[in-house]
Structure formats: C-alpha cells, structure tokens
UniProtKB/Swiss-Prot annotation:
It is an enzyme of class 3 (hydrolase). This enzyme scavenges exogenous and endogenous cytidine and 2'-deoxycytidine for UMP synthesis. One of its GO terms (cellular component) is cytosol. Zn(2+) binds at residues 101, 128, 131. The lineage of its organism: Bacteria, Pseudomonadati, Pseudomonadota, Gammaproteobacteria, Alteromonadales. It comes from the Bacteria. Pfam families: dCMP_cyt_deam_1 (PF00383), dCMP_cyt_deam_2 (PF08211). Keywords: Hydrolase, Metal-binding, Zinc. SUPFAM superfamilies: Cytidine deaminase-like. Its EC number is 3.5.4.5. Residues 47-167, 186-296 form the CMP/dCMP-type deaminase domain. This is Cytidine deaminase. It comes from Shewanella sediminis (strain HAW-EB3). Substrate binds at residues 88-90. Its cofactor is Zn(2+).
Length: 296
C-alpha cells in the first residue's frame, strides 16, 4: 500500500479497510471500476452512498496543497458505474490561478479515462462557485447529483440556480461529449503522437484552440492533459494543470519531469503557450516543446 494512504486507511471501518487495502497498490491512482465498487459494497456492508462518502478521505490523500494545506477529495461517478477520485493541487509559491480544484481533478480523471457522462459528484466540502460552474459544463450538468457528508443529496441546479452554461452560447455538445477534431502531424515520436491524439479530443468550443500537454518522466512514463474550456471562461482547465494533476494522482514528483510537449491548433483565437510555460517552469527545469498545427 502507498504511504500516502496509511493514515486514512487506519480511520476507516475495518471491513472496508480490509477490502480496500489490496487495491491501494503502487499503481493505484484513484480509479475503482464498477466491479471493484460492487465488491467493496458487499464486503464493507455499506450502502453505495455510504461507501462513496467513506472513500472521500482516500481521495483527499491524493491532494497536494502546499499553500492552503487544505485537503479536498472528490469522487466522480460515471454512467459506466466506475468511480474516479481527484484532489486539489497547488503549485508552491505560484499564483493561485494555477490551482486545480478537487472536482476538476476527478472530472478530468474520468474524461481522460474515456467516461462520457458524470452522474454523481461526491466531495468532502461544499463545492465552491468555481467548481459549480465547471460542473455545469458537463453533459446534463444541472442534473449531476452532489453528495456531501451529512447533507441531503441535491442536483447541481440546487447549488447553481439560474445557471449560465454551454446552451446559452449555443453549444450542443458539452464537456465529456466525444470530440474528434481533425489535427494531423507527420511524426514517429510516440510522445508527440500521444499529444496529438489528446489535442484532437480536447474541448474548446469557445476559442477553437484545441490543445494538449504530455509530460514524460525520467523512467519513460507519460502523463497527459487536455484543454477543457468553460462557458464562463475563467473556470476553464488548462492542459498543463490537468497533466500535473494526473501526475499527482499517480504519486509522481514534478521534479521527475524530463520532457514536456504542448500541441495546439493554429486556428484558435488564443494560445496557451505562455500559461503552459509558466506552470512548467514553476515545477521543473525543462524547456517546453511547442508545436502549432494548422487545422485540416
């Protein structure tokens, strides 16, 4: 079991901890599939809603909050039945806009895993306005059920009434809808090919600035992030922050980054290169490889 889970496991009911510990191996990064979830329900004796609340300390253990020292964990439950954990992340000494919120982390985890719809979000503290707006970008976002400890489950519309969202800007395919943008580049570099694939799946209906980041560590592992825009603009999630959040979930240190690639479309209204370099240089002594593609 990973050291970061030792404290929270000790505080769980024994039937749950006994069932959960074998899952928390070196590869665990917050994903529990529907079959594993069913096993945990059976072995713990908890109802699903009780189990998901009980798992929040495990999600919070994924957090990296060097500034706030405030650990927030979130769980996104997909239509597939799988659950995806996420946690807040801050960049030490850097501006707060680099921060990733727990709900963003969990939802991006689900998105990168191929999930097409989030039905429930479970979080250990009430979602801030930023996260409520981010969740409103999802497929049927207003219907997403929000679960909080010792609170009645409510749809997002309860927390964000009279919401402004994608439909107000005539967007009919919201976040997590399958995106496939035509981007191409002649390259045999596996890392660039991976970045290209993720850029083609990014969500940028407001600027058409399709983009993705891939980070490689010294042992050859790669971690990716896609651009996820928001109708309210500021809650948009940048691909570098998503990639760093992915690394954090996998228990990797940012100093292990040995290579970083940003691919973005030349046809967009903005460029993410400046913001991407700022975040990268805050955590690693690596130069950004920046590739701009003409749309087909």
């Amino acid at each position: 079991m990973q050291d970061r889970f030792i404290k929270c496991i000790a505080e769980l009911p024994k039937p749950l901890s006994d069932a959960l510990v074998p899952m928390l191996n070196a590869e665990f990064a917050g994903h529990i599939d529907a079959q594993q979830l069913s096993t945990l329900i059976t072995k713990s004796g908890l109802a699903e809603s009780e189990l998901l609340i009980a798992l929040l300390p495990v999600a919070a253990a994924l957090a990296r909050p060097p500034i706030s020292e405030f650990y927030v964990g979130a769980i996104a439950k997909g239509k597939s039945g799988d659950i995806y954990m996420g946690a807040n992340m801050e960049l030490s000494g850097e501006a707060l806009f680099h921060s990733v919120h727990a709900e963003q982390s969990a939802i991006s985890h689900a998105w990168l895993s191929g999930e097409r719809q989030i039905e429930d979000v479970i979080v250990n503290f009430s979602p801030c306005g930023h996260c409520r707006q981010f969740m409103n970008e999802l497929v049927e976002g207003q219907k997403v059920k929000i679960h909080l400890p010792e609170q009645q489950t409510q749809p997002l519309s309860h927390y964000l009434p009279y919401a402004f969202g994608p439909s107000d800007l005539n967007i009919t395919e919201p976040l997590l809808t399958k995106q496939q943008h035509e981007l191409s580049l002649d390259s045999s570099d596996p890392m660039i090919i991976e970045a290209l694939d993720h850029a083609s799946l990014s969500y940028a209906p407001y600027t058409n600035s399709y983009a993705a980041v891939v980070l490689e560590t010294q042992d050859g592992a790669t971690y990716c992030g896609r651009y996820a825009e928001n109708a309210a603009f500021n809650p948009s999630m940048l691909p570098m922050q998503m990639a760093l959040s992915t690394m954090a979930r996998h228990n990797r240190e940012f100093c292990e980054i040995s290579r970083a690639v940003l691919i973005e479309s030349a046809g967009g209204k903005i460029s993410l290169v400046g913001a991407t370099m700022d975040a990268l240089h805050a955590v690693a002594a690596v130069e950004l490889e920046h590739i701009v593609l003409d749309p087909e």
